Amino acid sequence: MAPGGGGGRRDGWPARGRLLLAALLLLWTRAASGQSSPQQSVILGMRLASCNKSCGMNPDGIIFVSEGSTVNLRLYGHSLGDISSNLISFTEVDDAEAVHNSTNCLELTKDLVVQRLVNVSRGNTSGMLVVITKFLRRSENMKLYALCTRPRADGPWTRWTDKDSLLFMVEEHGRFLPLWLHILLVMVLLVLSGIFSGLNLGLMALDPMELRIVQNCGTEKERKYARKIEPIRRKGNYLLCSLLLGNVLVNTSLTILLDNLIGSGIMAVASSTIGIVIFGEILPQALCSRHGLAVGANTIVLTKVFMLLTFPLSFPISKLLDFVLGQEIRTVYNREKLMEMLKVTEPYNDLVKEELNMIQGALELRTKTVEDIMTQLHDCFMIRSDAILDFNTMSEIMESGYTRIPVFEDEQSNIVDILYVKDLAFVDPDDCTPLKTITRFYNHPVHFVFHDTKLDAMLEEFKKGKSHLAIVQKVNNEGEGDPFYEVLGLVTLEDVIEEIIKSEILDESDMYTDNRTRKRVSVKNKRDFSAFKDTDNELKVKISPQLLLAAHRFLATEVPQFSPSLMSEKILLRLLKYPDVIQELRFNEHNRYCVRHYLYTRNKPADCFVLILQGKVEVEAGKENMKFETGAFSYYGTMALSVAPPDRSPALPTPLSRSASLSYPDRNTDLTSTSLAGSNQFGSCILGQYVSDFSVRALTDLQYIKITRQQYQNGLMASRMDNSPQPTFDGCATCSENFMERPELPPVDETTTLLNERNSLLHRASEEETI
């Protein structure tokens, strides 16, 4: 077999030129195929296809293969067939330059065994030649071979002279470790790569400031971990250099071991890349980013050991970084960043909304001024300095709900004093004391602040205890004339606290939910003291508003028959203001036992309830005629207000009298209970009338409340109508007229006209329950 262009090119064309030449020769040989012998094969060139070990092309374009490998060479030519493998062999040459000196194949080598030609193309223009390389001798590490061909089986061998026909066989690098140890070492290096990569992210992400916080307020396990990590984390650059050096060293060693284990080529690159990326980067960093504290604490010994091993290199580098870059900047949050961090992390922390609002309010304290939270001057409740502290003025003060009230003179902007409600504790409204007398006596200081005062400074002033109310003012220099202080409003400690907690504080006396929006409190148990003011046209007996208020509250709270569940407070007040309900009795010193001194007489019918307001009475009760004295706020005849029908037994007994007066603290209650137990003090019922079995006689001048049974029953019906109004029926007009004709009843109001049959049934049922 003659080599096509077998004379060779001593200067060695580039690969592209050689392939082009081979293609032209192939076309030429096909054109001349009619003149060639059908048995003659022509080889134009060869290239490396594959091998089972390390192989490839060196920079000079020469094929190199490993010893003891199977190599597949792709041959190009004409009329290639199975017999062509007998026409191909290799000869050993000294070097690549000597190939060009001769074309003789003096001695064929046995180190390369040509097997066969396979996968011949349909046109017999290419095929795959299988060559087996034997192992080199111990003293040899490489050999160079040249391709030899012959035109026929008995023809002479001709050596190719170009570099494309050369083949290097190199020594195979054996494993320097046993296979099991090699695999184990690769696994250990993968683990170390993951540890260093994870620690690099986990430890460096732990801020030293955060570690100090965890040491103080973390769980017991977190505190333990933080105490271990914090000393080495303070050496930030030294730790960083040590971890990076360890990571690079481990990854480099791992790549070399994988290359030696798998062999060079695409498989070695792919396996090392996949192993390092997945097991050395992704998994450990994903783990340490979530559990860096625990991983760093449990691997602290390994970290310290490697820091010690890399000390000669990593420590100088870290010092250089400290010098060039400066000390590590730690995470410090200012006020705005801290508030934003709390807002962003709200879904993940355990702070409730109220706690978050308090923290936010406290952080904003230094950014707000008193002008932002003050109550405008025109919205403030104030009192004139020349006011008289009578019942009307004091009731107005009580209804305002404020405990500190500014006192102004001439105009509201001229605040001269502060009145505390507690200053009025010993003031009797009947004395009509001038307000100036009280303010001059206590002389509370008036605290003024400027409108641009920050809330934190205002809070510090309030904490000093001087005052919990301050007058907000500013310097007004607008227009012509000298500047002057202009009062803008009031600010209190409550306003500052509300701004801190970001919520309104409502106590039992507040009338507004917000002093800026002036939104009123929706539901308040507000006491209207104006109803107790002096009305001479309603009361025949002169009684002070304070005593009327005390009697009203005593009946509503201490006497079950007048409790708000039975009789509304509004109806009770009307009842007390009705003519002849509040009466006076002048005591006759010359005739102590005259008939008019007796409010109740034993064994005589009575249809009224009596509450002593002022004075003393003597009560005689029981079979033993036990006598004792009582005073103000003792009451009698509760059973007379509702008497059981004749066909019904009396109700369960209730005490004949009770006293809420503090004037008799030394009353002998044992004697009272003994005397009451010894007699039938509850009276009896004869044909629907209440008959008292005790006597009550005046000992001094008396002022007392006397409510008849009919007045009480009318009050109950009016209360029911107020609570549940009923539609008007035809018969109600007649009932209202009869109700008006009774002289002892109070004036008929609009609810009385709504009485109907249903009210009558309710009235009878109420009488039975009361009895």
From Swiss-Prot:
The chain crosses the membrane at residues 176-196, 262-282, 291-313. Residues 238-258 dip into the membrane without crossing it. GO terms for molecular function: magnesium ion transmembrane transporter activity; sodium ion transmembrane transporter activity. GO terms for cellular component: basolateral plasma membrane; protein-containing complex. Cornea, retina, teeth (at protein level). In the retina it is predominantly localized to the outer plexiform layer, inner plexiform layer and ganglion cell layer. In the tooth strongest expression is observed in the cell body of the ameloblasts. Expressed at high levels in the gastrointestinal tract and testis. GO terms for biological process: enamel mineralization; intracellular monoatomic cation homeostasis; magnesium ion homeostasis; magnesium ion transport; visual perception. It comes from the Eukaryota. It is found in: Cell membrane. Residues 374-435, 442-508 form the CBS domain. PANTHER family: METAL TRANSPORTER CNNM, METAL TRANSPORTER CNNM4. Probable metal transporter. The interaction with the metal ion chaperone COX11 suggests that it may play a role in sensory neuron functions. May play a role in biomineralization and retinal function. This is Metal transporter CNNM4. The lineage of its organism: Eukaryota, Metazoa, Chordata, Craniata, Vertebrata.
